[in-house]
Amino acid sequence: MSDCIFVFQIPFIVYSKLDQWIFGNILCKIMSVLYYVGFFSNMFIITLMSIDRYFAIVHPIKRQPYRTKRIGILMCCSAWLLSLILSSPVSKLYENIPHMSKDIYQCTLTNENDSIIAFIKRLMQIEITILGFLIPIIIFVYCYYRIFSTVVRLRNRRKYKSIKIVLMIVVCSLICWIPLYIVLMIATIVSLYTSNIFRHLCLYLNLAYAITFSETISLARCCINPIIYTLIGEHVRSRISSICSCIYRDNRIRKKLFSRKSSSSSNII
């Protein structure tokens, strides 16, 4: 679902990066909030997936009473609700601002720097750092350390296959998100502290291009996840191979029928 949110946002992100925002101030705020909702929800969902794999392999008996469809839906809805709550302050940070010319607008961080805006920037910095990265990464490391220790000890190949997809999704998500996280951290620090050191840092790093590049990498994750499911998931691979075998078999049957018709027509002649 978080991948669908990012795919839906791509046209709006393009308009924003081209400094040709034509959708008004309200939609600017909505798209900005949705961007962070997608970020937090992605991290929370893959964290829940890692915890689920941890209990399934390390504590399979303890997990059984809690592995129900109702609890799964409740946990996912809680992750999305928490993502929305954490992202809602972003609506105060982004504005539809005239850029260069009065006829051209840009959906970007507001130029205002009052106490409320400064507090929200610090709040988002803390949220992204602690809730968006540090806590999920600690959970990932602990869960997969215990999982691999258990799999190696039990020498259970089937359980190793069951965690392979989840681990690949987690690793790809981290690789795609970490560059954007670093750039956003630098941008937040630059916007909060306007000393000469950070002004020169902003000048030399050219944060606008860095943010665009890191956002492109983060959006690439939406394309990588289906490839992971296709290449690693045995169920998906078996379905694809069965479809391909059916197509191949149908083509062979058609060729045989065509050759028989050709031979019969030649005999008649």
Swiss-Prot record:
Signal peptide start and end residues: none
Entry GO CC: host cell plasma membrane; membrane
Record-level Gene Ontology MF annotations: C-C chemokine binding; C-C chemokine receptor activity
rRNA-binding among keywords: no
Cystines in this chain: C28-C107
Keywords in alphabetical order: Disulfide bond, G-protein coupled receptor, Host cell membrane, Host membrane, Membrane, Receptor, Transducer, Transmembrane, Transmembrane helix
UniProt keyword annotation of Transmembrane helix present: yes
Record localization: Host cell membrane
Membrane topology: Multi-pass membrane protein
Full protein name: G-protein coupled receptor homolog C3
Organism from which the protein derives: Swinepox virus (strain Kasza)
